[in-house]
């Protein structure tokens, strides 16, 4: 596909990476997207806060449209899981097994992977909105319903308080027996209820449940799990890229990491994990990157280049 060093490799084919690719190709920069096919967006059954979709859009459909748009402008794709990123003499080399690609710049857009309850029904519950993964994205749809918030008590108290502005019936479902601290006191004062630790999560095909030790069952229209997330930012830690305490890549106002020429966008950086934010970060990174690359005067070819 590319025998020489190309301008940019975008690692990750979610909303952030696909937006960056579209921008880069419209800047007439050679661009390859390497994607493992596991974008977090694919879990979204329907998004109603994504601009331009008044009737909502599924994550799968949004990804399809964004990939189609990037392809229309000549973006090339590889379906691979990159396991190594190296830098030598100003050129990045990305490797997957015995295969490798080289580029002058890299945009890391690999996102994060949510830690979900260890249960066989998780995908089905997400698909029917019984298990929701983003309170900022879809708490509006859960308004005035019974909402559970599942995870370590110290972590979920603040989330429960946030959700209290959407419903009168918010329950903290602890995955541990730790103390909740001041955040828990604030949540309780706002009317958030706390269930006993040690129960069992369940799903009946349409609603999630929590069975307590004494046999009582609490049913929820939706449960939000907050169990943390895993990131692949470590793949560039060997290059000297600085990470936050949470393992997120630290970037400047242009989305460049502490490694010159290496950019990061989307959920892999610190900030609000929203598609709209990721798209904006992609525009910033792609534009700065384009202007930082050597000037390439246009030679008319009479047709679109590829």
Positions of PLM-derived features:
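Short, well-ordered coil/turn residues at beta-beta hairpins
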Residues: 12, 109-111, 116, 150, ...
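Extreme N-terminal leader/targeting segments of oxidoreductases
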Residues: 1-7, 64, 300
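FAD-site-proximal beta/loop scaffold in flavoenzymes
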Residues: 124-141, 227-272, 276, 284, ...
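FAD-binding core/adjacent interface of flavoenzyme oxidoreductases
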Residues: 1-6, 77-145, 222, 237, ...
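Beta1-alpha1 glycine-rich phosphate/pyrophosphate-binding loop at the start
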Residues: 6-61, 145, 152-178
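A Rossmann-like FAD-binding core segment of flavoenzymes
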Residues: 70-89, 93-95, 101-103, 167-248, ...
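A conserved FAD-binding loop/helix module that cradles the flavin
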Residues: 21, 157-160, 167, 265-305
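N-terminal glycine-rich dinucleotide-binding loop that anchors FAD/FMN and/or NAD(P) in oxidoreductases
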Residues: 30, 36-38, 45-72, 134, ...
